[in-house]
């Protein structure tokens, strides 16, 4: 089934590239997009929402972020990048090279993540140097643009721009709430989770706004006190400046939105690159992170107490001010246009 999915990805990339002046690809499709670029002679730009490229400055984002005591940081960091890419390439190599063969191309010597560096292809790093300082061992073709924030028109198209009247009213009648969002992390027991959040609101005296994400929390709103509310998909760029702090799953986009709004942040991680972003938040002094397995009433109330402290609030606000001065989308558009214009 996985092989069928990869075949579908290749077919979709091939179709999407028809008539394109330039290809812009994320990490999940870049092996296929690189093959199409080479077969058709179309220029290509890579776009990374998380820092996947090899460096000795931090671990590969999908691996543990704590350096073992018996290794140097440089040794461990490089090793995690190399092992992660080896595992990735072993799993995808046959499918990628089969796709390349269908386009009349020779097999790839390695995953695109490494090969594109050797080829000198440009990569747009869609995050800020304020959050991820530029690694010393990245070449000049790796351009850190700043975070890519969705424009309001795009928000409207995906149904996130509509602001419910009840929400605007609820925000107006009390102090800013703390936002708790679960994003793509499904909640296994919604009633139990909501009961925990209600008790946390009672214990801390804070107002809590719960973003359901992919979880089905419908039908539970009738049981809520005035201090707790539920919402579905919404524009974080609108909402977060009206909040006091954020607690979430640690996706790259939600992390960027919270930090850009200048909010103290706590990340409950489950998998993927979430611990990486949690570690970034902790290093900034803008909050912290822990495994979602630690999520219980005592832990959450302790986290909420930390996030409303004056020191973390001040540090997060300063970071947000610097991030709001950046325009990652405009920087990326300008660079893509320059590259397309050279071909």
Question: What do the PLM-derived regions correspond to, one by one?
Answer:
Residues 77-78, 82-90, 94-99, 103-107, ...:
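Nucleotide-activated sugar donor-binding and catalytic core shared by glycosyltransferases
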Residues 50, 214, 271:
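Residues in the short beta-alpha loop(s) of Rossmann-like NAD(P)-binding domains
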Residues 1-177, 184-206, 220-222:
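Nucleotide-sugar-dependent glycosyltransferase catalytic domains
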Residues 180-210, 215, 232, 236, ...:
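C-terminal substrate/ligand-recognition segments
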């Amino acid at each position: 089934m996985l092989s069928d999915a990869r075949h579908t990805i290749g077919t979709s990339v091939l179709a999407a590239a028809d008539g394109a002046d330039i290809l812009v690809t994320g990490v999940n499709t870049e092996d296929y997009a690189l093959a199409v670029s080479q077969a058709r002679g179309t220029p290509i730009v890579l776009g990374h929402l998380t820092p996947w490229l090899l460096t000795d400055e931090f671990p590969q984002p999908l691996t543990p972020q704590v350096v073992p005591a018996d290794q140097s940081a440089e040794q461990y960091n490089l090793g995690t990048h190399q092992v992660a890419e080896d595992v990735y390439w072993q799993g995808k190599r046959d499918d990628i090279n089969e796709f390349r063969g269908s386009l009349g191309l020779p097999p790839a010597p390695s995953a695109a993540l490494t090969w594109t560096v050797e080829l000198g292809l440009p990569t747009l790093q869609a995050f800020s140097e304020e959050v991820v300082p530029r690694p010393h061992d990245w070449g000049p073709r790796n351009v850190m643009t700043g975070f890519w924030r969705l424009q309001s028109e795009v928000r409207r198209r995906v149904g996130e721009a509509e602001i419910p009247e009840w929400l605007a009213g609820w925000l107006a009648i009390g102090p800013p709430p703390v936002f708790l969002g679960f994003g793509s992390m499904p909640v296994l027991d919604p009633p139990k989770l909501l009961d925990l959040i209600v008790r946390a609101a009672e214990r801390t005296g804070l107002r809590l706004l719960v973003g359901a994400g992919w979880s089905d929390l419908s039908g539970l709103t009738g049981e809520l006190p005035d201090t707790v509310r539920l919402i579905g998909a919404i524009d974080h760029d609108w909402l977060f400046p009206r909040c006091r702090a954020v607690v979430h799953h640690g996706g790259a986009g939600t992390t960027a939105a919270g930090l850009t709004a200048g909010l103290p942040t706590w990340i409950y991680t489950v998998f993927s690159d979430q611990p990486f972003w949690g570690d970034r938040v902790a290093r900034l002094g803008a909050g912290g992170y822990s495994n979602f397995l630690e999520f219980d009433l005592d832990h959450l109330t302790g986290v909420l107490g930390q996030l409303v402290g004056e020191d973390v609030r001040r540090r997060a606000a300063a970071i947000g001010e610097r991030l709001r001065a950046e325009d990652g989308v405009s920087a990326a558009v300008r660079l893509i246009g320059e590259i397309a214009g050279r071909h």
